Amino acid sequence: MLPPGSNGTAYPGQFALYQQLAQGNAVGGSAGAPPLGPSQVVTACLLTLLIIWTLLGNVLVCAAIVRSRHLRANMTNVFIVSLAVSDLFVALLVMPWKAVAEVAGYWPFGAFCDVWVAFDIMCSTASILNLCVISVDRYWAISRPFRYKRKMTQRMALVMVGLAWTLSILISFIPVQLNWHRDQAASWGGLDLPNNLANWTPWEEDFWEPDVNAENCDSSLNRTYAISSSLISFYIPVAIMIVTYTRIYRIAQVQIRRISSLERAAEHAQSCRSSAACAPDTSLRASIKKETKVLKTLSVIMGVFVCCWLPFFILNCMVPFCSGHPEGPPAGFPCVSETTFDVFVWFGWANSSLNPVIYAFNADFQKVFAQLLGCSHFCSRTPVETVNISNELISYNQDIVFHKEIAAAYIHMMPNAVTPGNREVDNDEEEGPFDRMFQIYQTSPDGDPVAESVWELDCEGEISLDKITPFTPNGFH
């Protein structure tokens, strides 16, 4: 989340540049800019594609939710919109300026440096905090679905989003504008200068006023701000995400195994009644596959996030203790190269381009995306049924149909089961994810089971990261 030079090291030609500045030689004055080399052209193309992809993906997510009433009705999508907006700001307010500086080899925007640094910290922190809020929302919806349905109102969702953005602003604009984030190196208009330049006075013969068109937007962080901001922006949120997604997996595992045991018993009873060979291990294998898919799903969520941001935040905390840093010891481990640091900065920002794919590409979003892009007639129309295990963390194709007698068999094997119309959950402590299994069987007004329609699962289904849609009291969305 830092500009070039933030790791306390200098560009290879930076000292030569300062020497020219000290001698009064203007750089980049009337002379034309040198032509871009092959590496600069490749860098420009790659960064442009990344920025465009980030913009399009997050704009598409926002447009889909604004257009679809069904998506707007889901409170979790409030957090998805907030995440998309923060990632959109990364693509608009952060990436383009750094991309130009990367290609040009210097910071051409002068005193805008401080504002850009504040935007960088704010947008990146907001994106990470929104990911943390989404994980907490999903855990709450899965572990306490009925309480979640009562408590998670639009007002509550907006309060949670507001807190995430407020915290992001507090740790970015206030410290940056007050220069609390900087080390003790002298600076001019947000542009760091060597100590010998800082000690010059206007009446000295070789005094030079900095040329803002040829400077480096260097913002070396002091130790206090580097560690505290990293804790708030990354380490605490990632710890919360690890805990919540671990709990989600355990809850999903329990649900899958309990449902699988009911499936095996029902299949065994049905096959024995029809004099067919009993194969109870089929559902067991399906259960293992489902658990594996849930694990893969959660691994993608955490794996992408950690791989994108962890390297940067490790360096962000390590750099103030480097030997080349103004606050670092005279002898210590050297700072990383500028190229390495920049690569990890872009890795972190690349997370904003992947979030729309991870958090929004489920069946409902895909349908609206197809309408927005005008390809609804060409896109796949394979029906997707979301199985409410772990509150729609998994989606399956409609292939295997369990009819009336199997659904009824589940109820006969659950002696304490009651229909949802007669069962109320008043005690949150007694509520558990498996309570929703009672909602499989429902009686219509004329006494016929509604479950005779279908209850569909697909053991070979395709995984997708779906939104959270908690069960309503009547057992349907």
From Swiss-Prot:
Gene transcribed to yield this protein: DRD5
Expression by tissue: Neuron-specific, localized primarily within limbic regions of the brain.
Lipid-anchored residues (S-palmitoyl cysteine): C375
Residue ranges that the Swiss-Prot or TrEMBL entry lists as coiled coil: none
Topology Cytoplasmic: residue spans: 67-77, 137-158, 247-296, 361-477
Name the UniProt record assigns to this protein: D(1B) dopamine receptor
Involvement in disorder: Benign essential blepharospasm: A primary focal dystonia affecting the orbicularis oculi muscles. Dystonia is defined by the presence of sustained involuntary muscle contraction, often leading to abnormal postures. BEB usually begins in middle age. Initial symptoms include eye irritation and frequent blinking, progressing to involuntary spasms of eyelid closure. Patients have normal eyes. The visual disturbance is due solely to the forced closure of the eyelids. In severe cases, this can lead to functional blindness.
Gene3D superfamilies in UniProt: Rhodopsin 7-helix transmembrane proteins
Location of the protein in the cell: Cell membrane
SUPFAM superfamilies: Family A G protein-coupled receptor-like
Keyword presence, Cell wall biogenesis/degradation: no
Consequence the record notes for mutating N7Q: Impairs subcellular location
Protein species of origin: Homo sapiens (Human)
Signal peptide segment: none
